[in-house]
C-alpha cells in the first residue's frame, strides 16, 4: 500500500487517514464527492461526444459503488445483483427503476456492461423523463443527475449517521488497502 497514492485530485491515502483519525467528517464528505465527481460524473458530463450507453455504464458503476459504501462492503464480488436491489429499494428518485425480475439490473446493467447493448427492448435516451416504462425508455442524463444528488446526500449523511460512518470507514479501509 502506498500512502502517497491519490484517492482524488486533492487527497492522498495518507491525507485521508489523517482526516479519518481526527474524525473530520465534513472534509471527508467533500473528499468523497470530489472522488465521485472526478472518476464518474465529470468524464461523461464534460465529454463533447456524450452517448447514453456510456453514461448509463458509468451510472451502473456509481450505483454499485455507492451501495457498497452504504453497506460497508469490502468488495461486491458475487453480490452485484443484491447491490442493485438494495440501492434501488432506497427512497430515492431512482426507486422507479426497481421492479419485478430485476429488469434494470438484467436488461440495463448486465446488457450494457457485458454486451454493450440494452436488452428487453429498452431504449437509452438523453432527454425526457427518467423512466418511461410504457415506451421502455430511460433518460441516461436524468439518471446520472439523480445519482450525483444521491452522492451529495450520502456525503451529508456520513456526517451524522454513526452506522453509515462506520460502514464508510470500513469500505475506505479496503479502498486504501488496495492502493
Segments (PLM) and residue ranges:
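Anionic, Ser/Thr-rich low-complexity intrinsically disordered regions
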Residues: 12, 71-74, 79, 97, ...
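Short, contiguous, well-structured surface segments enriched in hydrophobic/aromatic residues
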Residues: 27-89
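Amphipathic, Lys/Arg-enriched alpha-helical patches that create a basic surface
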Residues: 126-179
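Histidine-centered, metal-coordinating catalytic motifs and their short helical/loop contexts
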Residues: 98-124
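Alpha-helix capping at helix-to-loop junctions
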Residues: 68, 93, 114-118, 153, ...
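Surface/interface-facing alpha-helical segments and adjacent flexible terminal/loop regions used
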Residues: 1-35, 42
